[in-house]
């Protein structure tokens, strides 16, 4: 069911004047109140009906002319009804609700006793901006013209703080729902509201916990997000009569300012009058309060709290600038009225996006919760019982958890895991104390036999895979379902709720609840099948309805007086809050690392932030003054908002703070008290990068495992406990790691030179060992099977803006199993299995690294090695790694086994996800070698920077390979192999340059790797992490540009069937069918088979891709865009980075329309390269930081031309439409546009405050290309443009559209004069005031 969007109707807007033509045609409209508390769902105004997906901001402006005097209605003595009851907060409790049912408006002059929490008295609109975010987009309505628009909070606050005399328009913020923002914690609802709200007491709790999106985007909404709103209105705003959406009740606290309400009771006669008034289209002529029998006007002053019951018709006026907090609720004590209002919305055809979200889904959950709480019989699915009902059960590993970034990803990744069998003996005792309860999966019934019951209890039936194809997928909670014993005969409904023990006492329901349940059952039964909206959590809707009917029958004679207990019948069991580190954001967590991190962080003792080492090059230098952090600093003239240190000063190796102590013994590090290396290590504090425990290695009691030291960060390792458990975590580095090599006189460069000099002293020794390595490896060739190991890298260099796409749990566990199968016969038995490789890497990164492994065909490695040896003779320093024993680390580079067998079994799955990582094997190793390992670790610990510099060059090569792989945009992404023995199909030309990839990913030729044998175990054994990578040979020239590989084979023309025959319909016929499907349906079709997967990715089906307002752009999205090769791409108002956009445009040569409005200039600057495609349309409206200097960079010819590319023209020379609204540009930018955009036809310059008449003179001057090419220009809200600009437009021979609306200095008379003067040659008309259009 569709729900509210970010937009909605305003609180205080006068109705529009109806056109005479509309009156004749009897067209009706409804303008809906959405997320408003004093104004409700239907906003009765008169407007021509438009498609619900149409952008209503383009509706022509209609000046409001009321048929009544608002001032008269404010003074009139006719509205003297006495509906509102004054109460004190202490009397407003749940017992009052059970007795009176919330049917009359209530006013509280003091908030004491209500349980309300509000911000400090000096809280202002500016503070709202700081807490919800200055860039948060809010829907704003122009009260006079009724035109809705979007503003950032920063823009609206500037308007709100403008003195009243200087406001040329009346703007009102509508629907700022601030749940899941920092403001949420400063505002608390009345206690009674929390007790009766369906969202809190009926909706599954785990879905609410999944909500992370602060806005009301329906695609990201996990529950009806209508709990807390902030309303900001200026003096003079007025909202005509309306009812709140869905029949919701409203709580309303006037924090600052005041309000005046007109109230009409929801009698059947008044509701009929209201519906007739809405459909009449005469709202602006008739004041509804004059049509009804009784109406009450009441004034709310600052500090008042107001409660509006369901269905009450009300209008609102704002006499003074006001700030109001409130919210909407559905509850169980006036359900018939709520349903009646929802039916009125149906009849008046209110748009879905302006209505209560998930309305009927909520009704189903209400019935289920009542049935469960009075009968202890649940109709939720097993999954939902585990997640929300919190029935005690053995804890499932958090690795089964799963989070999804968007609706599209959830559709593309169907979760096919099966529920685990959950039986434990220690549950039996507690099971006896519980009320008998049947299984909730509907597998048994009262009529089933005892043997069937026992069978049903003995093993839970597996839920079908389709059950998990949910619209909203959830993370596994801490607790899951507990199996209970089943009684053959159901007892009569006992009292109690999940939160309390079941007793023999009967639960009495109030007459209001019984009437509500009956109305809900009748309504849901009357709905057609396609409108029942049964939510995913309900197992059997028909059984639920029967259960409710039984409850109504049993409770028909309940005593109303005994039902008034002051205690809610329906509550969720109290959930113990998870401990969360202070300030930790509630981001989406992955299955393997992040979920465990949050749970284990509390065990880390006195864990603190790492601090500067104050010794590295970065710590000792001063600010650069050039990076975006420096430019933000106040001392460099910035606003000082980021509060970040200079990028070049970010510490390379931050250290543990001096307050850190051991979790076991509680003492600090004592490594300075001993001399020997092993003793030093046992006494130094080490922080685990997975569980974050800080501990002395000597204090650990685990003897049968090994720790893995992180050479990139001081005092950092993967502790033996996590390593033994197979847990995965990202390799940590200092924040300044990726900038270290850029520092002038960097120590990394010096160390590299020193290393070259030292290693150059032993060339003969290295050559002899290099010659022995191939012989050793060829002997082991027939019995070694390489695991698909990959190089693990910090995400800062390769991942796009640190976005991760975590793997599905079944893939993770599947690779673990595969890992154990791939262990070679010679591997040591004492080694623990390694965790799955790449669990924290993006699928695109994993697939690109898999590309390296596919470069080497079996049997060719010896030949390739001989070629490599010749090319490496001049780079002997690289050979030093050959005689170094490979150290084991968490995710081994490439593989440590000799070479691939003749035929490697690998599915296509390896292209899109991480391959498995087998355990490393170690050959024979004597005491001498072991001693060398320890001594080498002793040397390397203080020289961590060495490995960092060695990794940088190969990282570039890996990145380049990833880039080239990305161009295979039609490669299937089938996630499962067709058969186990199927060899992966490589695209043609994939091994054309095998010499570039013949060495291992850590820089060592694969033939030079040798295996280390088993050695005596020293508990706990600590092994240093090797350098992540080694630079490639100097003789290889690194390409700076993307090199596109040859195209892969075309998709098949027919669809193969199971019997080997081809389907009768060929590809082109299927493509014709696919062309009618939406993108969402295409994604579903892509999961059918490999052939459909390739067909559905045809670029003809994806000419336009729209990601506007997408909260995060992940690598998976980017790879999907590349694969589909769109012509038009909308990335407006996203947080895409420069690296991501550069990566995209390098691979989209056919892109023609690009929308980047609302992005940052840092991201848009990616277009200043020679790889920018020849765009036709470019939208950079409201790009932050885009001024004249940046426009010069954007329009000037690129300086990074490819070799042989001599074109010195701008890459934007083909632009036909350019949108620059809201930019701080001057005539200098317009001169560049004239020079570099000869084909420009449509130019949008609205809200550009520096555009003047002289700017128009430039655009239309003699000799300019724009004089003849310009057909449309938008100058709305350009306050410096006057009537004189119209005389310049007479020069343009092809001008057809001139938008001068809201230009203060442009007059209506000037426009009419322009039309008269142009009528000689061209007929122009004024479609709207100051909107000039050429008449055909």
Curated annotation (Swiss-Prot):
It is found in: Nucleus, Nucleolus; Nucleus; Chromosome. Changing residue 1069 to A: Decreased ininteraction with UBB. SMART domains: JmjC (SM00558), LRR_CC (SM00367), PHD (SM00249). Residues 410-430 have a biased composition (Acidic residues). Changing residue 1072 to Y: Increased interaction with UBB. Binds 1 Fe(2+) ion per subunit. Residues 1-25, 410-465, 727-843, 855-1034 are annotated as: Disordered. Fe cation binds at residues 242, 244, 314. One of its GO terms (cellular component) is nucleoplasm. Substrate binds at residues 239, 259. There is a cross-link at residues 857, 890 (Glycyl lysine isopeptide (Lys-Gly) (interchain with G-Cter in SUMO2)). Histone demethylase activity is inhibited by fumarate. Residues 178-346 form the JmjC domain. Zn(2+) 2 binds at residues 624, 627, 630, 646. Histone demethylase that demethylates 'Lys-4' and 'Lys-36' of histone H3, thereby playing a central role in histone code. Preferentially demethylates trimethylated H3 'Lys-4' and dimethylated H3 'Lys-36' residue while it has weak or no activity for mono- and tri-methylated H3 'Lys-36'. Preferentially binds the transcribed region of ribosomal RNA and represses the transcription of ribosomal RNA genes which inhibits cell growth and proliferation. May also serve as a substrate-recognition component of the SCF (SKP1-CUL1-F-box protein)-type E3 ubiquitin ligase complex. This is Lysine-specific demethylase 2B. It comes from Homo sapiens (Human).
């Amino acid at each position: 069911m569709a729900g509210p969007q970010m937009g909605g109707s305003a609180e205080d807007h006068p109705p529009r004047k109806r056109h005479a033509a509309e009156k004749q045609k009897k067209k009706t409209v409804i303008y809906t109140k959405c997320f408003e508390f004093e104004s409700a769902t239907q906003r009765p105004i008169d407007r021509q009906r438009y498609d619900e997906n149409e952008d209503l901001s383009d509706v022509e402006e209609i000046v409001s002319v009321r048929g009544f005097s608002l001032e008269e209605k404010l003074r009139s003595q006719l509205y003297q009804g006495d509906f509102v009851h004054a109460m004190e907060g202490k009397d407003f409790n749940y017992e009052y609700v059970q007795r009176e049912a919330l049917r009359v408006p209530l006013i509280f002059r003091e908030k004491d006793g209500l349980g309300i929490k509000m911000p400090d008295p000096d809280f202002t609109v500016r503070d709202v901006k700081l807490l919800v975010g200055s860039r948060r987009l809010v829907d704003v309505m122009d009260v006079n013209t009724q035109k809705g628009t979007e503003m950032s909070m920063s823009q609206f606050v500037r308007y709100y703080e403008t003195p009243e005399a200087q406001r040329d328009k009346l703007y009102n913020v509508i629907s700022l729902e601030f749940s899941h923002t920092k403001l949420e914690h400063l505002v608390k609802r009345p206690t009674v509201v929390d007790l009766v709200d369906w969202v809190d007491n009926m909706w599954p709790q785990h879905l609410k916990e999944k909500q992370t999106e602060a806005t009301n985007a329906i695609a990201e909404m996990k529950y009806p997000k209508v709990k807390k709103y902030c309303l900001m209105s200026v003096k003079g705003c007025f909202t005509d009569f309306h009812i709140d959406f869905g029949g919701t009740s409203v709580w309303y606290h006037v924090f600052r300012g005041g309000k005046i309400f007109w109230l009409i009771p929801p009698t059947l006669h008044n509701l009929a009058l209201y519906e007739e008034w809405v459909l009449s289209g005469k709202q602006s002529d008739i004041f509804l309060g004059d049509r009804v029998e009784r109406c009450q006007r009441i004034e709310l002053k600052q500090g008042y709290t107001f409660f509006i019951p369901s269905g009450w018709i009300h209008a609102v006026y704002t006499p003074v600038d006001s700030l109001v907090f409130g919210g909407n609720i559905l509850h169980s004590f006036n359900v018939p009225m709520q349903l009646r209002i929802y039916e009125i919305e149906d009849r008046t055809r209110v748009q879905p996006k302006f209505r209560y979200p998930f309305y009927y889904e909520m009704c189903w959950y209400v019935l289920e919760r009542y049935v469960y709480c009075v009968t202890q019989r649940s109709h939720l699915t097993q999954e939902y019982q585990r997640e929300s009902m919190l029935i005690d059960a053995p804890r499932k590993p958090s690795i089964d958890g799963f989070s999804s970034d968007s609706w599209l990803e959830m559709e593309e990744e169907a979760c096919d895991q099966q529920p685990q069998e959950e039986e434990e003996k220690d549950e039996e005792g507690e099971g006896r104390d519980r009320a008998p309860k049947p299984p909730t999966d509907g597998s048994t019934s009262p009529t089933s036999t005892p043997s069937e019951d026992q069978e049903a209890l003995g093993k839970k039936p597996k839920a079908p895979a389709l059950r998990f194809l949910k619209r909203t997928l959830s993370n596994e909670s801490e607790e899951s379902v507990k199996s209970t014993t089943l009684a053959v005969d159901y007892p009569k409904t006992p009292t109690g709720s999940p939160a309390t023990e079941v007793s023999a006492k009967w639960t009495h329901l109030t007459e209001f609840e019984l009437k509500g349940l009956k109305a809900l059952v009748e309504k849901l039964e009357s709905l057609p099948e396609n409108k029942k909206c049964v939510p995913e959590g309900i197992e059997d809707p028909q059984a639920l309805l029967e259960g409710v009917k039984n409850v109504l029958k049993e409770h028909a004679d309940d005593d109303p007086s005994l039902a008034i207990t002051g205690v809610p019948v329906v509550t969720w069991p109290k959930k113990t809050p998870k401990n969360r580190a202070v300030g930790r954001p509630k981001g989406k967590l992955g299955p393997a690392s992040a979920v465990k991190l949050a749970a284990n962080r509390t065990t880390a003792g006195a864990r603190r932030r790492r601090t500067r080492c104050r010794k590295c090059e970065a710590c000792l230098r001063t600010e650069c003054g050039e990076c975006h952090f420096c430019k933000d600093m106040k001392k460099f003239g910035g606003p000082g908002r980021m509060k970040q240190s200079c990028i070049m000063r970010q510490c390379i190796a931050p250290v543990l703070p001096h307050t850190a102590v051991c979790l076991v013994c509680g003492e600090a590090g004592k490594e300075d008290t001993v001399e020997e290396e092993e003793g030093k290590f046992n006494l130094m504090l080490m922080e685990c990068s997975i569980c974050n425990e800080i501990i002395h290695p000597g204090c650990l009691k685990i003897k049968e495992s090994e720790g893995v030291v992180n050479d990139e960060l001081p005092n950092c390792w993967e502790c033996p406990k996590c390593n033994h458990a197979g847990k995965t975590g990202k390799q940590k580095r200092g924040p300044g790691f990726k900038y270290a090599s850029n520092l002038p006189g960097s120590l990394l460069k010096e160390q590299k030179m020193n290393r070259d000099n030292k290693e150059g002293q032993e060339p003969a020794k290295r050559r002899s060992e290099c010659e022995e390595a191939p012989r050793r490896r060829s002997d082991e060739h027939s019995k070694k099977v390489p695991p698909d190991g990959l190089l693990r890298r910090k995400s800062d260099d390769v991942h796009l803006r640190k976005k991760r796409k975590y793997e599905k749990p079944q893939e993770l566990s599947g690779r673990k199993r595969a890992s154990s199968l791939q262990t070679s016969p010679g591997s040591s038995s004492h080694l623990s299995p390694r965790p799955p490789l790449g669990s924290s890497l993006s699928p695109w990164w994993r697939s690109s690294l898999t590309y390296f492994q596919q470069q080497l065909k079996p049997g060719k490695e010896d030949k390739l090695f001989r070629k490599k040896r010749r090319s490496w003779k001049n780079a002997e320093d690289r050979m030093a790694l050959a005689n170094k024993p490979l150290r084991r680390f968490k995710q081994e580079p490439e593989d440590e086994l000799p070479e691939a067998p003749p035929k490697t079994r690998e599915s296509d799955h390896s292209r899109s996800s991480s391959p498995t990582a087998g355990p490393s094997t170690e050959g024979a190793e004597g005491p001498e070698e072991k001693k060398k390992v320890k001594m080498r670790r002793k040397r390397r610990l203080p020289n961590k920077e060495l490995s960092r510099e060695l990794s940088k060059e190969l990282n570039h090569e890996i990145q380049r390979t990833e880039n080239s792989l990305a161009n295979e945009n039609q490669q299937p992404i089938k996630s499962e192999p067709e058969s186990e023995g199927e060899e992966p199909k490589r695209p043609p030309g994939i091994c054309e340059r095998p010499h570039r990839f013949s060495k291992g990913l850590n820089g060592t030729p694969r033939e030079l790797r040798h295996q280390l044998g088993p050695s005596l175990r020293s508990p706990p054994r600590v092994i240093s992490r090797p350098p992540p990578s080694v630079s490639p040979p100097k003789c290889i020239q690194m390409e700076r540009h993307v090199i596109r590989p040859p195209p892969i084979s075309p998709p098949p023309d027919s669809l193969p069937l199971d019997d080997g025959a081809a389907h009768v319909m060929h590809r082109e016929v299927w493509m014709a069918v696919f062309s009618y499907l939406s993108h969402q349906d295409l994604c579903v079709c892509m999961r059918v088979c490999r052939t459909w997967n390739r067909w559905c990715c045809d670029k003809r089906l994806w000419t336009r891709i729209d990601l506007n307002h997408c909260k995060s752009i992940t690598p998976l999205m980017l790879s999907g865009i590349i694969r589909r090769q769109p012509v038009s791409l909308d990335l407006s108002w996203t947080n895409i980075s420069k690296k991501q956009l550069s990566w995209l445009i390098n691979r989209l040569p056919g892109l023609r329309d690009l929308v980047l409005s609302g992005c940052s200039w840092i991201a848009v600057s990616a277009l200043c390269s020679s790889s920018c495609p020849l765009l036709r349309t470019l939208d950079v409206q409201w790009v932050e930081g885009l001024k004249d200097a940046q426009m010069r960079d954007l329009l000037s010819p690129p300086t990074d031309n490819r070799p042989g590319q001599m074109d010195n023209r701008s890459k934007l020379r083909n632009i036909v439409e350019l949108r620059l609204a809201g930019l701080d540009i001057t005539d200098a930018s317009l001169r560049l546009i004239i020079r570099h955009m000869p084909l420009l036809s449509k130019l949008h310059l609205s809200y550009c405050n520096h555009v003047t008449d002289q700017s128009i003179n430039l655009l239309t001057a003699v000799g300019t290309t724009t004089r003849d090419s310009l057909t449309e220009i938008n100058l709305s809200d350009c306050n410096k443009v006057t009537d004189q600009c119209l005389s310049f437009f007479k020069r343009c021979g092809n001008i057809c559209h001139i938008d001068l609306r809201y230009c203060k200095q442009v007059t209506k008379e000037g426009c009419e004069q322009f039309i008269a003067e142009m009528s000689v040659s061209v007929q122009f008309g004024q479609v709207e005031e100051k909107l000039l259009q050429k008449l055909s």
